[in-house]
Amino acid sequence: MARILAFDIGISSIGWAFSENDELKDCGVRIFTKVENPKTGESLALPRRLARSARKRLARRKARLNHLKHLIANEFKLNYEDYQSFDESLAKAYKGSLISPYELRFRALNELLSKQDFARVILHIAKRRGYDDIKNSDDKEKGAILKAIKQNEEKLANYQSVGEYLYKEYFQKFKENSKEFTNVRNKKESYERCIAQSFLKDELKLIFKKQREFGFSFSKKFEEEVLSVAFYKRALKDFSHLVGNCSFFTDEKRAPKNSPLAFMFVALTRIINLLNNLKNTEGILYTKDDLNALLNEVLKNGTLTYKQTKKLLGLSDDYEFKGEKGTYFIEFKKYKEFIKALGEHNLSQDDLNEIAKDITLIKDEIKLKKALAKYDLNQNQIDSLSKLEFKDHLNISFKALKLVTPLMLEGKKYDEACNELNLKVAINEDKKDFLPAFNETYYKDEVTNPVVLRAIKEYRKVLNALLKKYGKVHKINIELAREVGKNHSQRAKIEKEQNENYKAKKDAELECEKLGLKINSKNILKLRLFKEQKEFCAYSGEKIKISDLQDEKMLEIDHIYPYSRSFDDSYMNKVLVFTKQNQEKLNQTPFEAFGNDSAKWQKIEVLAKNLPTKKQKRILDKNYKDKEQKNFKDRNLNDTRYIARLVLNYTKDYLDFLPLSDDENTKLNDTQKGSKVHVEAKSGMLTSALRHTWGFSAKDRNNHLHHAIDAVIIAYANNSIVKAFSDFKKEQESNSAELYAKKISELDYKNKRKFFEPFSGFRQKVLDKIDEIFVSKPERKKPSGALHEETFRKEEEFYQSYGGKEGVLKALELGKIRKVNGKIVKNGDMFRVDIFKHKKTNKFYAVPIYTMDFALKVLPNKAVARSKKGEIKDWILMDENYEFCFSLYKDSLILIQTKDMQEPEFVYYNAFTSSTVSLIVSKHDNKFETLSKNQKILFKNANEKEVIAKSIGIQNLKVFEKYIVSALGEVTKAEFRQREDFKK
């Protein structure tokens, strides 16, 4: 008699379901946008952040140069105004025929300069003052910069200064086989001319020295001030306030990941896990001395190879550890850098940890050196340590590490040490009826990925809406899509795999047609495996003929790890075999079934080498029983990923639930046998298997409704269902030979599986509920993106688009294009459209509003007038003859009816095209197959991938109304609101 909520959480979707007393009460879908650039995966805020950073950098440089200009003007008795530019024009001091500053920098070493030329040399060096601190550059850029700096440093050995080097090597030198000059400065994405700032500072000092020798008179104070201002560097911020708190001691900060104690903890964890695995698989018991021998090797050198590990443990060189890959078992690159920078020392462990902490938190080199000076370090050590780059923290503090590491040194695993010390993760005792915002919980520091944060935010929004509508529940089941928590490149790889999988299925469908096979999921999979296995049986090595594929009884799809023991229904756990081989294998792994037959096993090993690595490992696995003992099946049933546990704990720790029955144990983890918990994280593997078994079609990823089907399955994936399903699969595997002998049909199995359906008529009931869903989308009201395009253009470039100079002036007046710093740019995003209606004609008009309008706090009041290409009409002033209706934002829900439609339809607003005065709209569920006759009139160019209508003219719409959709998909008409002004 439980009330259960279930969620299928993706990076841009939430599927949800609510069941009460085993009855499906409600389900729905929420779709939202990923907060990232779809092409690059970069944050949507990145362009603004980079632009803001560039503005600040340029402003600082301008202030620095202005300061220098004042100093120079005062010292050299020059006019400061001559060095200032106005309205983007060239400053007076730089007009006329002038010698290149590179040539002047060379001459400065050999002859007396004029005051004006000396001023230009100082300003030129100060403007492009080289690279100093590149700690915060990304790894790829940093590597290129360092390489170029080193190469140029070697070349500089033959010259007095940087200026002389650049002048003689590159100035007015032709490119090879070209009439173009070589670049003296770096161009975009070029690092060849990168010079260390220290060399430029040395050059300016040398020029001051030489000019004084040549008779140029200036004060020592002036020289010192110029050098100080020209090479001034702002102190970097301290980020200590951003460090999260310890999982066990909430008043303690987390330990730096690159501290010696943290390295010891990580090394101990890996070594203990390795020794325990050897104990379980080989029955070998290792002592505390063995553990210490391995640990000492790591702490001495920062590395431990697999070869060293085998030698220290007395294993043969050809022994292969589980997961062995590459040379190193443990490699701590940062630890190696740390011990190298330290050299010989007499520092305590605590001091070393504090030093690592300072390096991690203090990003300003001068401040860091001051902090390091309080330790027993010489200047060389301080200089070396200050160059290190440390970041990131563990989840626990030094205090916790100092408690657990002594027990781990005795050979206890981390969780065993925590249990012995009674260390428990701090939990929230103040449970709420509604889930609080993630950033108000002690998990707030665990996630910084904006894509994941958006998914968690939308999950909370839907969850709280359901709790408000239906009240408290007993349980919440969640499934996180595998792309949640992945970075953009990882998600792109997943998407590529999905597309390849889709293509392979479509190709197999065509092949089925050619061979006269029924087009069903089973035959499609058989054909895919047939091709992957190069037309050979995975266990016998016999050639599979086309006639074998056409005979339903000849071949079977086998689960490499028996499904009833693994719950692994993935493609990588399936092979195509002759029925006879499957009958022999039964409910066993390949090694358990055929390992005693050495000749056959050798053949299987050879065959497996031609298969994907993941499949190969499963086939050749000799230790599956050990994995079973380690809850391997549970891990396939339950999602143990970090991000899944995080969402689970966030929900469990802060939400108040209805009490579970007395015989349910809520103290056990959801992966432990006999556990009964309020929140469970289900595996996508389980959902996929039940989806197939209960007769739901394969996912159509273009159709949003599949998220709700998954949520329903998650809601009913309880222990009793899973057990019944497991028993059913076990019977299939164990009695395979007998069943085939009796020719039991697939229909018999379909009837048998009904015994573990949640209730009678389950599939149809779910499909009926799915048909009732209106997909919810949040309206995107917040202005975002750049104010205008980056490229500045000449006025003439717009003449063709707007019909000459007068047209461009008109376009500027209407805000179609913008003038910034005397140049013209295209608009940024249109984030809002205000809809008006003529009081007499009832025709609709649209006033576009861009991010630039929002930034300028100027509300446009002219509606777009349609014009032909190459001309521009006056837009229409929305005066007293027009009435304001509503504002549209991206994903606003509207009800529209064109003149050809029989009735109005709900659609989501996507965009407005000012050139055609028309809307772009989309169907809520993006489902092509269910388009009604009326909808087909609207979405006449729809296809399976997208149901979108473009060029919907607004003036003559019969119905044009705005609606509000809740997080649960409940639709209500929007109340009238006064037009919103930016100034309010």
UniProtKB/Swiss-Prot annotation:
HNH Cas9-type domain ranges (all copies): 487-637
An example molecular function term from Gene Ontology annotations: endonuclease activity
Superkingdom field: Bacteria
Biotechnology: The simplicity of the Cas9-gRNAs RNA-directed DNA endonuclease activity may be used to target and modify a DNA sequence of interest.
PROSITE patterns with a match to the protein in the record: HNH_CAS9 (PS51749)
One Pfam family cited in the UniProt record for this chain: HNH_4
Catalytic residues in the record: 8 (for ruvc-like nuclease domain), 559 (proton acceptor for hnh nuclease domain)
A single GO BP: maintenance of CRISPR repeat elements
Alphabetically ordered keywords of this record: Antiviral defense, DNA-binding, Endonuclease, Hydrolase, Magnesium, Manganese, Metal-binding, Nuclease, RNA-binding
Chain residues that bind Mg(2+) 2: 8, 483, 707
Annotated positions binding Mg(2+) 1: 8, 479, 483
Free-text function comment from the UniProt entry: CRISPR (clustered regularly interspaced short palindromic repeat) is an adaptive immune system that provides protection against mobile genetic elements (viruses, transposable elements and conjugative plasmids). CRISPR clusters contain spacers, sequences complementary to antecedent mobile elements, and target invading nucleic acids. CRISPR clusters are transcribed and processed into CRISPR RNA (crRNA). In type II CRISPR systems correct processing of pre-crRNA requires a trans-encoded small RNA (tracrRNA), endogenous ribonuclease 3 (rnc) and this protein.
Assembly information from the UniProt record: Monomer. Binds crRNA and tracrRNA.
Domain text: Has 2 endonuclease domains. The discontinuous RuvC-like domain cleaves the target DNA noncomplementary to crRNA while the HNH nuclease domain cleaves the target DNA complementary to crRNA.
UniProt protein name: CRISPR-associated endonuclease Cas9
UniProt organism field: Campylobacter jejuni subsp. jejuni serotype O:2 (strain ATCC 700819 / NCTC 11168)
The organism's taxonomic lineage, starting at the top: Bacteria, Pseudomonadati, Campylobacterota, Epsilonproteobacteria, Campylobacterales
Encoding gene, per UniProt annotation: cas9
